[in-house]
Amino acid sequence: CGLRVVRLGLRQEASTGEFPVQMLCGVSESGQQLAQRLVDRFARHWPVLVPRHWAGLAPDVLAAVAVRFPASARLDADDRRDLMNFSEGCRGFELTLPVLRQLEQCAGVVAWLADAPDFPLWCRVVTQGWSWNAVRVAGLCSGQKEGEARLRKLVGELLKNGPEL
């Protein structure tokens, strides 16, 4: 239908427990430009807002919103090296987290990740900022060591078979 998510409420509605969503489809040229500006802005704000306001949202819901965002980041040679080193176990998770967050904003990455079996783990730890203990309690991994190993494997697969970075 052409509607695009331009805003997601910061608080759940009291009556339904749902987050309000604002969607827009410009019908005139100026309306289309406005819609694009709002989508671009929402995409830029997304990485900051998700862990603060939507940390409990289901990974498939987050993916459904984020997959429609325009690419807002590009990786440089240093970033790609960090990802390779992380996937090979030579760089720590916390040191790589800024690049992992940036990776989500590259063209086609969220769509590729959303199809991966470990996307819920990625989403909870990388996108939503859950602690390793929280993902363990949620049953997504047995702890940090196993969780990091699975994320390393996922990044390695993305580098080999994912979208061009």
What are these regions, as identified by a protein language model?
Residues 2-165:
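Terminal substrate-recognition subdomain of acyl/acetyltransferases
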